[in-house]
């Protein structure tokens, strides 16, 4: 985990990561007690919906767009968890959100560029990114404590 670190939005260090600094949005969707994961291609690992910022988008708009584009999910509310600062392969900042969802798409609703959508009680294997578990643990901690 030397290449990535999570900073909670409740931490004073979070001020170092203003929204304009975020290049990626990562969303941890919960379907009840299960987490929703996607696999973009069959040979890659599982990941949370994640996308890069397009010209003119806010990071919140990126998160909403990616939820729809990768999982056909519309969330009524996105809660900001914090940021992940990654240094490998190049420095980047990701804003991490979580949300509650009421609907998970059927197989015929899955976007063409997504191989699978799954709901899990634990982290599935293989993971596309090692820091997915760090992000999941932060989201689970927020759900347990109720501190958002």
Predicted regions and their residues:
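Active-site beta-strand termini and strand-to-loop segments that position acidic
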Residues: 29-32, 99-101
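Residues that flank catalytic or metal-binding motifs in active/ligand-binding sites
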Residues: 23, 93-95, 113
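Conserved Nudix-box catalytic region and its N-terminal flanking loop in Nudix hydrolases
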Residues: 30-70
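Active-site-adjacent beta-strand/loop module that shapes the phosphate/pyrophosphate-binding cleft
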Residues: 84-107, 118-120, 135-139
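A short coil-to-beta-strand element that immediately follows conserved catalytic motifs
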Residues: 73-83
């Amino acid at each position: 985990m030397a290449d990535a670190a999570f900073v909670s939005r409740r931490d004073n260090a979070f001020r170092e990561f203003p929204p304009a600094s975020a290049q990626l949005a990562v969303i941890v969707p919960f379907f009840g007690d299960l987490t929703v994961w996607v696999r973009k291609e069959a040979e890659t690992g599982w990941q949370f919906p994640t996308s890069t910022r397009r010209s003119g988008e806010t990071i919140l708009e990126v998160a909403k767009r990616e939820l729809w584009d990768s999982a056909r999910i519309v969330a009524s509310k996105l809660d900001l968890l914090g940021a992940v600062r990654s240094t490998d392969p190049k420095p980047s900042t990701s804003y991490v959100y979580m949300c509650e969802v009421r609907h998970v798409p059927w197989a015929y609703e899955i976007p063409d560029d997504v191989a699978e959508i799954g709901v899990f009680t634990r982290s599935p294997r293989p993971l596309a990114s090692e820091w997915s578990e760090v992000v999941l643990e932060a989201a689970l901690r927020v759900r347990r404590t109720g501190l958002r």
